[in-house]
């Protein structure tokens, strides 16, 4: 893994954009994208740039089951708001959270990824080392699947809804096998609350109890962290 330490998330987003821009200029056509606050600075750099995205395909990591695309808490909505409405892509794939057949939708999403191999995959990381909704204990060889959200995740998400009963109880999520098939991975993490997860991902054993640790086995991973998220790392990783 290559580790890049920046002063803050603004610089981190700019550094991530440099990587994506260079990969696109070198022929990358399919981007694996993520949601949440971590990639917002990256997406802002996309929007502010003169980069033409009209020939790019994006494939998102996940989506809540039961949320319509126009629900402000859905990842369809997030991606339109933070990127696609201002920087249109040729084609953008996000799992169908309103599907009547989740298993079939997961198989279809695996086929989409197979038909459009991901050139650069963007990731964040959870405090417990999860990537996307792949929580500790998720098999490393799994493809796109339905995830039953943990009570902690449901409670954490309840602040976005009127009450906890409205919070989605499951999500459709790319598996670690899909993520590992990407040619290049860029993982971003900011803040001291991510420091322990970053340390375990990079320096700890490869274990399904730390889903992100599988990235140690990927041939091309760049980790972009601010100083706070890097504080637990061995000095050799700090530039």
Curated annotation (Swiss-Prot):
Reactions catalysed according to its record: alpha-D-glucosamine 6-phosphate + H2O = beta-D-fructose 6-phosphate + NH4(+)
GO molecular function, one term: identical protein binding
Keywords: Carbohydrate metabolism, Hydrolase
Protein origin, superkingdom: Bacteria
PROSITE patterns: GLC_GALNAC_ISOMERASE
Pathway recorded for this protein: Amino-sugar metabolism; N-acetylneuraminate degradation; D-fructose 6-phosphate from N-acetylneuraminate: step 5/5
Any one cellular-component term (Gene Ontology): cytoplasm
EC number annotated for this UniProt entry: 3.5.99.6
Keyword DNA damage: no
GO biological process: carbohydrate metabolic process; glucosamine catabolic process; N-acetylglucosamine catabolic process; N-acetylneuraminate catabolic process
Signal sequence annotation: none
Coiled-coil zones: none
CDD domains: GlcN6P_deaminase
Function: Catalyzes the reversible isomerization-deamination of glucosamine 6-phosphate (GlcN6P) to form fructose 6-phosphate (Fru6P) and ammonium ion.
Recorded family membership: Belongs to the glucosamine/galactosamine-6-phosphate isomerase family. NagB subfamily.
Protein name: Glucosamine-6-phosphate deaminase
Organism, as annotated: Lactobacillus helveticus (strain DPC 4571)
